[in-house]
Amino acid sequence: MKRAIKLFGFSLMMTILFVGCGTSSDDELTGNPKNPKKEYPQTPMHFTEPNDTSGKKTSPDSMVIDMLPKTQYIELTQEQKALVAKSNDFSFNLYRAIHAADHQKSNITSPLSVAYVLGMLNDGANGNTAKEISQVLGFGATKQAINEYCKALIDQAPIADPSVILQIANMVAANQDVTLEKDFKNDMQNYYSAEVASLDFSKQSSVDYLNTWCKEKSGGMIPSIIDALSPEDLLVLMNAVYFKATWTEKFDEKETQEEVFTKADGSTIKLPMMHRNAQIRYCTNEVYTGIWLPFGSGDRWSMKVLLPEEGKTIDDIVKSLTGESWENNYWQHAIVDIKMPRFSTKSDIMLNDMVSKLGAPSIFDPQKADFSLISKNQKQFYVSQMKQKAAIEVNEEGTKTTAVTVSMMTGSNIVNGKGEFHANRPFVYVIQEWSSGAIFFIGTFQGN
């Protein structure tokens, strides 16, 4: 008889919960809307190029590298830097699938939270199951390399900027009749700093214990993530990412006014629109114009807000995002008149189908899943549920976001430039740590 792993994830900015199993169709995940594109008013976003005698655009590296104290760098090996690029590809691939599932709805997700849960699963996986997980993550690396990369972010990202609060937490909860393999348990504790607990899944107190952990690690933004446990459930893996930061330059609340926001279908609503003029970085290409809004000290964390170019939509933006294209963006200085809504978004996403479509269907298949490295006394189990809950709040002060991801295994029988950036229509946003390049959150806001 096979039993199941349940995976859950959450974060303060967004909460991610993995709690399900399933397969996915073979439809291509392009993120394109099924309905014809709607035309709606376009805000001008014309930027004057800064003076540059070399004729070349300036990358963020050359602009700020001398300004950043090295003690605050996230120190990665060359192999780990390569994993960041692969991880960002995974982030955009996953978000493309999430957006395609409901492209007209605001959402938020933490791909990193999902990656941590998959990384923990990978330590217990064997054979083709391990191969699929590695391919989905895009790493193609050894388990050791993946573990060390995850540990580097857990150890260093929270202290990259003392003025920013970041917490990454992991939980491994085993049903009381499951004996975890020593190597698996050690990896969970040494590389993922995971709390490892043995619980009686037949008791409500175990559900309460895990939900209390979820609430605490998400700063109260996600009160619970597990509805119930079954005695047939074998293991619960949880990841939580909590992020809270103030803008480097705050918006003046007195400048916030109700203004028109035009949705993708052409309908309009009134939203509180924050406003300020600032010297910031921006980039532009044929699909979108983006601005770089820094948090904290201004040198580590930022939210990049992406607004479609004329004739484009956020679906086009999501479709265009890849690790390579993202890395190749050039950010220049400009003095920008910024308007963007004060907003909050919550997401509750079942990830089984999406992870299956991305290339790891066997982890949800009772006949094909191989997690024999987790426990010798329970060789046959599979992932029954993968779910992510996430939440984000953006206001004049800054941003608070969290995500929780859960996996459950269950039994089966610019100085010289000027411009305007008015986010009065749907947009995409990305929260990223600069020195590592790691993407922590991706979302869209569509006025709902």
Predicted regions and their residues:
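Non-catalytic, conformational "gating/processing" segments within enzyme and secreted inhibitor domains
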Residues: 104-105, 143-309, 331-415
